[in-house]
Amino acid sequence: MTNIFVSYNQNVQAEQSLALRLQTLGALYNLGISLPDRVGRAGLKETTKQRIDKADLFLVFATRNLTKPVVDEINYALTAKKKIIVVYDKDVKNNLNIKEVHEIEYDGKRDNPEKIIGEINKVISKSKEDDTVGAFVLVGLGLLLLAALTSKNK
């Protein structure tokens, strides 16, 4: 089973909802999805570090600039030598400048799913299990775009 750590910006409802949905959907894809432990005290908790250590992939969908907790989690994942993918909305400034972090920018109005999946496949290798991970990340992007469309129509 592939384990994925999904981080999100706190106080950004769309990102938090997406992370929770992905955690639920992960079971359908036979993926272990972990989220950060952000209950109680601030700072990077041991439980979050353990979840990152267990992960094969670190994933963030960013609709806003990355917050300090997310950047701290990314930095920890770097020290743990994890594959890291940050999927940015085109309107968000990429506030990381770390070559080991794979940043994918998307434009919900212009980009097609093949572009995003192609970028993801550059990061992950080519096994059947990795095809599942790529599909899972694409589902996450679809959910994020759907949430954006829904919020604009309100």
Region locations from a protein language model:
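Short beta-strand/turn micro-motifs composed of small residues
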Residues: S7-Y8, A62, Y88-D89
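Short acidic, S/G/P-rich loop/turn micro-motifs used as interaction or catalytic elements
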Residues: N11-A14, V39-G40, R64-K68, V92-K93
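Conserved TIR/SEFIR loop-to-helix hotspot centered on a Trp-containing motif
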Residues: R64-K81
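A short helix->loop->beta-strand "cap" motif at the edges of active sites that frequently abuts
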Residues: A80-V92
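Short, well-ordered beta-strand core segments
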Residues: F58-L59, I84
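Conserved N-terminal substructure of TIR/SEFIR domains
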Residues: M1-L57, A147-K154
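C-terminal interaction surface of TIR/SEFIR-family domains
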Residues: N94-K154
